[in-house]
Amino acid sequence: MKRHFFGYAAGAALFLLFLFYSADARQGAADGLRLWGTLLVPSLLPYFAAAGVLTRLGAVDALARRLAPAAARLFGVSGAGAAVFLLGLSGGYPLGAASVGTLYENGTITNDEAEHLLLFCDNSGPAFAVGALGVGVFGSAGWGMLLWGIHAISAAAVGILFRRRTRGGEAPIKPPRKTPDFGAALGGAVAAAGQTILQIGAYVIFFSALIASLGALGFPDTLAGELAFRIGAPLSFFRALFTGALELSSGIGAMAGLPLTPGSLALGEFLLSWGGLCVHGQAGAAAEGLKMRKRLRGKLLQGVFSAALAYVAASIIM
């Protein structure tokens, strides 16, 4: 009973929050559904399906053989792990986690390597960093590319910092399966992508409802206002920080109107690298059966490191 007390209390608090602020929760859920249907499904589903086809046809295995020496030296993982790192950086959240889950499920990597890869292989793609953050917030694709570059460098740095003391990862825990034909690979990939995108939608809708309900309760505005008063930073800065800590897209949207300063660029970089609890939940659903503890530690470190790099780089450039 005592062991589960926090979970019981949190569940009861959420139930009461949604009960007393049901109208706000309903509107937030509707906004989350709209975000999922109009932005996330069109932008993520094709990438998930394409990555699934490549994995099922053995393209990742072929790339892994070429990347194996560098992957072992830099990260202490197999070549498949390095291939997932590149997939995650190109496709965005949570493609890296989904790819790790697929490789673990088909026996290409072990449980230990899979959980280690979640430290640094699930990242934002350039489309979101440039489009939503660079152009959408700062009005510049150039700033977006710089922030995504720092994001990629910081992810690699976390992977190197927590390098596994192995020689290129372990052997597969299952014998390699026969490569399916293209039709079977496409069908399986699309079905898996559909399941993953539905899970992502559930998390986005839930966290959108949560943010709306907390807003009606007065959080995060009360805490953001107190910090803004004490530190002297804009209220919108801390509102974006607290919102983005929960859900990335909402946090980036809350940054609209912030002046272009090293501090605001560092904030955007932190949110991009941390990803938000919503993205962490999506990663857990996409990589079912794997523990997320290492991932949370790695993403928090990546967020702090990338924010510091962004602040220094912006201070030099501006």
Functional labels for PLM-detected ranges:
Residues 59, 190, 194-272:
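Transmembrane helical segments that form the transport core of multi-pass membrane transport proteins
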Residues 2-3, 138-178, 283-318:
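Juxtamembrane and boundary regions of transmembrane helices in multi-pass small-molecule transporters
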Residues 1-10:
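N-terminal membrane topogenic signal
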Residues 74-138, 240-259, 265-289:
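Alpha-helical membrane segments and immediately flanking helix-loop junctions
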Residues 9-22, 29-49, 53, 148-230:
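Selected transmembrane alpha-helices and immediately adjacent juxtamembrane segments
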Residues 19-30, 56-60, 131-133, 141, ...:
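Transmembrane helix-loop junctions in multi-pass membrane proteins
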Residues 42, 46-100:
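Membrane helical hairpin/interfacial module
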Residues 63, 85-86, 117, 144-149, ...:
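Hydrophobic alpha-helical transmembrane segments
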